[in-house]
């Protein structure tokens, strides 16, 4: 079994004006480490995926003038998600996998 969490870029959301969202993301990152330690002797793998910028409906509403050419379609990160959920995800156990599609 695998628990996989999605994380934003912690360095970016740790900056001024990110408020509750930034705090929540840092808390989630801490929880990944805690759960990994608590479940280390079990068959449950804990990891997180930190994708790069994604083109989503939420992003287009939050950043109406966004011209980020590095932003990718969410589907571009599907293979990384499948990897973490499969037995191959054992290589990333307890880690935050920073993926750039």
Model-predicted segments: where are they?
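C-terminal helical subdomain
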Residues: 48-49, 56, 64-101
């Amino acid at each position: 079994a695998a628990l996989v969490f999605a994380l934003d870029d912690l360095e970016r959301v740790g900056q001024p004006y990110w408020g509750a969202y930034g705090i929540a993301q840092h808390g989630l990152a801490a929880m990944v480490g805690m759960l990994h330690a608590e479940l280390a002797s079990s068959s449950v793998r804990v990891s997180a995926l930190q994708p790069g910028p994604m083109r989503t409906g939420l992003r287009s509403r939050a950043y109406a003038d966004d011209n980020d050419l590095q932003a990718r379609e969410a589907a571009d990160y599907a293979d990384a998600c499948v990897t973490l959920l499969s037995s191959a995800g054992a290589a990333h156990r307890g880690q935050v996998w920073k993926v750039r599609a």
